[in-house]
Regions:
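Short, conserved beta-strand element in jelly-roll/cupin
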Residues: 4-19
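Short, surface-exposed beta-edge/turn micro-motifs
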Residues: 6-9, 36, 55-56
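A secondary-structure boundary/capping signal
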Residues: 13, 41-42, 62
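Flexible, glycine-rich phosphate/dinucleotide-binding loops
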Residues: 18, 26, 67
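Short beta-strand His + acidic residue motifs that chelate non-heme Fe in jelly-roll/DSBH
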Residues: 19-20, 39, 47-52
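Short acidic-glycine-tyrosine-enriched beta hairpin
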Residues: 23-43
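Double-stranded beta-helix
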Residues: 48-84
Length: 84
């Protein structure tokens, strides 16, 4: 999914997690490992998380509260959003 306005900080608390980031024009993979690093994800980026180890835990910090209308859950809708 992606967000229209929300900024997120993804931190791997335990294990390993592959985060795929797609801006609609290209894709980049980031491996997050046990508190070693975090990933700042701006609005308008489609992300997918793949848990690489059993028991992996991802902590997500956001700059705003939950707002369902901020979510883009359909990839085709996301491509239209980034084309604007």
């Amino acid at each position: 999914h992606a967000h229209k306005e929300c900024l997120q900080l993804l931190i791997c608390v335990s294990g390993k997690i592959m985060v795929t980031c797609d801006n609609g024009f290209g894709v980049v993979n980031h491996m997050l490992e046990e508190m070693g690093n975090g990933l700042l994800v701006p609005a308008g980026i489609w992300t997918k998380q793949e848990y690489q180890t059993d028991g992996a835990v991802l902590m997500v910090l956001c700059d705003r509260g939950y707002e369902e209308e901020d979510y883009i859950r359909d990839y085709e809708e996301f491509k239209k959003f980034v084309a604007l």
